[in-house]
Amino acid sequence: MTHDFKGSLMAGATPTRALADWCAALRDSRPSEAVLRESARHVLDTLAACAAGMRQPLVRAAIELERGINAQPGPVALFGGPERWTVLESAGLMAVACHALEMDDGNREGSIHPATTVVPAVLALGWQQEADYLAFLCAVVAGFEVAVSIAETLHPHASQRGFQTTPVAGVVGAAAACATLLGLDGAGIESAMGLAASASGGLFAYLAGGGNVKKFHPGHAAREGLRAALMARQGVAQGPRGVIEGRAGLLQAFGGITQWDGSRARERAAPAIARSYLKPYPCCRHIHPAIDAVMALKARAAWQAADVAAIEVETYGAAMPHARLPWDTLEVAQLSFPWVMALACVDGEVTLAGFSEAARTRPDINALAACVSVAQTQECDSLYPASGPARVTLRLRSGERLSEWVADPLGSADRPLADEALDRKAAEAFGLVFPAARVRALIGQLRRLEPWPLAELN
């Protein structure tokens, strides 16, 4: 299917309805093979994050909480997790797991993690509805389009007001994706989006403490987005029309934006899922270009971490809340420029092991983390969010200065993560839960663009 909102924006149609119509049309005119392949890559990445996340104490605690609330087993599985649950519980718990280790994908221009809300919601529903893989992939494409279209309009206005765009826009994307899978028409999908918008929320207050609440934002969005789609199908309530751009709608409430005609979404040459990134490193995406710069410096110059007197990072304003974060917990360390920069310099890589409690007590990394400074520059600001730049300068004890500029981090649409690298990332994550033979089979199966039953993932 061609990405053409001009055809969807019929006379008198609102931008919200045009998005809903576009989602509904995916069932009749499926995306191109290239777009489906990209959807499969994001699904592979997301399910790998989900499997790894299921082993985290925070996720296990969330599972125990849900078990205590509802002791009766449900019909729907958890990918990589125990027992069976209601469809809403499954969606919410898988979304928390997807985001637990900062491995999940994102979209820079919207500053959003779309897959962590969309994929778990559609997977849980797909299991319940006995859907096939191609229908699932199409619904994921639809959910990305809605979530990113909202988020890229809200960003940076919403974050400046203290809102995180992932739960604000992600809940509406999850609703659109689930409504698409359920076979609702444009009016029904718009109703689901309208219902979901009342569940939008999520604050950036965690940057000042309580960082693990961030992990629950996608869980809320996935669960309530799915609930909204089910409500729309059953006719339980009618969602407000034009909920994105309308008076007191999403854009006005969260971004102070009073006018939106959807033109930015219409003008995109590629669907949102093809413009979203996959992470090579399990940490905040704002830090990735600086990691790439350190890796480039290691590749072209002979130096050791012990030679470094100071690490100077230049970045853009949206990244600055991470400039001086501590690293006392795994969740906050993954968002901390000082810790990640020091880790990259000392170990020459950034992996999950570098955020463990044992790693966070290492004297060598702690000493270098104290020597990291981060500054906002006009040069970086002028390029963001169209690109995500950073410059890293290492000041060596010898007096020498080594500097590297990265215009866009690895994993972006312009610098895509290779299939081989994605498969390695997925294999490492799946390997925490599944035996080697199952890992190989999973990766191969998720790359098959065929209508095989989603039940095979149970």
Regions found by a protein language model. Name each.
Residues 97-152:
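Hydrophobic alpha-helical hairpins/lids featuring a short glycine-rich hinge
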Residues 128-140, 183-190, 238-241, 302:
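Structural helix-adjacent loops and short alpha-helical linkers that scaffold large soluble proteins
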Residues 116-123, 170-177, 223-227, 289:
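Well-ordered alpha-helical segments within folded domains of soluble proteins
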Residues 195-203:
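Flexible glycine/proline-rich, aromatic-decorated loop/lid segments
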